[in-house]
């Protein structure tokens, strides 16, 4: 249980980084976190999920600018979600699969709320993950059924979009 909580805290914090950096076309790995206003590098001990936000009253320790509450919400939601998954599935392949998928969905949702765009990479990651999970878990008939149930509507949307020369649904 403690491991699921810690994994959720770390994942929630990293999800916040992804939500900030992907819309700005920045690397999600380097450089380390910094303040938007004063550009001070955030030391590891000031970057502890949830606790740092609370101890610093949701502000940069140097310049006092408020840190977006959405990052704090992510840092709370993700470990709660991981604990629910842990109590439902234990540390199993299903736990890790669902934790990954839900983390991607949370990330896409928060980016969508901020920018009104869901980058294509999230659809690709979810499709690939779902396919791999299906291959490892299900029988071949389900692979084709899954591919057809996703592929046919997407093919129809792209075809209709080409036919009327207008984007029907945003694909990022």
Tell what function each PLM region has.
Residues 86-97:
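Transmembrane helix-loop-helix
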């Amino acid at each position: 249980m403690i491991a699921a909580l810690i994994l959720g805290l770390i994942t929630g914090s990293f999800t916040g980084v992804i939500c900030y950096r992907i819309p700005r076309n920045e690397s999600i790995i380097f450089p380390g976190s910094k303040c938007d206003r004063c550009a001070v590098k955030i030391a590891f001990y000031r970057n502890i999920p949830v606790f740092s936000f609370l101890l610093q009253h949701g502000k940069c320790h140097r310049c006092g600018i408020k840190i977006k509450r959405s990052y704090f919400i992510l840092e709370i939601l993700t470990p709660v979600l991981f604990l629910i998954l842990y109590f439902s599935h234990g540390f199993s392949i299903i736990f890790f699969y669902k934790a990954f998928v839900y983390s991607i969905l949370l990330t896409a949702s928060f980016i969508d709320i901020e920018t009104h765009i869901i980058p294509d990479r999230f659809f690709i990651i979810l499709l690939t993950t779902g396919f791999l999970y299906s291959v490892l878990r299900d029988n071949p008939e389900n692979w084709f059924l899954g591919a057809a149930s996703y592929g046919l509507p997407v093919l129809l949307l792209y075809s209709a979009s080409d036919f009327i020369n207008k984007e029907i649904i945003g694909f990022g």
